[in-house]
Amino acid sequence: MATIHLLSDFKEFLRLLNAHHVEYLLIGGYAVGYYGYPRATADLEVWIALHPANADKVVAVLKEFGFDDPELSADLFLKQWQIIRLGLPPARIELTTTISGVDFGECYAAQVTDVVDGVRVNLIDLDHLKTNKKASGRHQDLADLEHLP
């Protein structure tokens, strides 16, 4: 697969997700790059499983990462179609609870786990990534779809 370089904050965040056993999948531009179409991206997009135990783990990760806001609660990660953004592009981290066209459980069961720039990462598999890109229908997603194998 393609060589990908992660910002140090992204590496730290992914390591924390792994250390806390968060059920997550890397999606978006970094996943597209992993499958052979490296392109500029403004953020690290992470899809998280939507259930209470996982939401608690995500909150623990965010606090350890330095994002300890009084409004931070597990409830933020228990709603469908929720997107939480941390930081600014190109170093933004985006957490989402739902994406178009695919089911987290199915995607998690089919995940690809690999070491990316020295960090173990759970990625959405290529078939589900393509399904998501097609279902999303955004211009960038359709362009990605044309370049994926």
Per-range role (PLM):
Residues 1-149:
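Compositionally biased terminal segments of proteins
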